[in-house]
Amino acid sequence: MKKIETSNLSMQNIKKVIFDLGGVILNIDFKKTEEAFQLLGLNNFLDHISQHHITDFFEKYETGMLTDAEFITGIQKLVGKPLEEEQIIAAWNALLLDFPPARIALLKRIKTKYRTFLLSNTNSIHHIEYRARLYRDEGVYIEDLFEKVYYSHTVKMRKPGADIFRLVLSDNNLKADETLFIDDTLANFPEAEKLGIHVHHLKPGTDITEIGL
């Protein structure tokens, strides 16, 4: 496999593209959720989950092993006081920012050129919010932009595990050497690369609209 790091992708032989969501299509900022939870009394939010690590409780939620109600109860226990459900949801969703229109336009355009897929480590509460937000702002649901979408909380697996990449490949009869995976987190690449998938690290300050898709 080839790791593609240049600003302009070499797309020769690439026929399928797998996109990450947060930090690639949807702008996110973990700091905003950290600050929101600090106001609620949880002062070490980033010790539990960030772009680069996750604790067992949050991993269970992002792999569908906890219900929304169980997640909210767990947050109340972490904070140590009975916060309102709406407060927790608002703080949890604070990290979700915007979908730049140019990215949505790109995804619509390249569907005629590549088979495109979404592969996201996410959860039920976030999914409800960003799905509604995209429809409100752009008149389209996230699922309509791809041939198929894979959310960690529905398939009960998450990146960087090899199984979730195997699922996407086998589920859609994809050849790894014809497939490109775009993500903003380097830790998500090793297992994909072992399977022969090409990868592109979307570095801070770069945008999918600028990399030659």
Explain the meaning of each model-derived region.
Residues K2-I14, S124, R131-L213:
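Asp-based, Mg2+/Mn2+-dependent phosphohydrolase catalytic module
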Residues Q12-P101, T112:
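N-terminal helical cap/lid subdomain that shapes the substrate entry/recognition surface
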Residues I18, L119, F181-I182:
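Generic enzyme active-site microenvironment
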Residues D20-G23, G64, L118, V149, ...:
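Generic structural signal for small/hydrophobic residues in well-ordered secondary structure
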Residues K32-E35, D56, E70, G74, ...:
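Alpha-helical elements of Rossmann-like donor-binding domains used by nucleotide-donor carbohydrate transfer enzymes
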Residues E85-Y135:
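Substrate-recognition element of Asp-dependent hydrolases with the DxDx(T/V) motif
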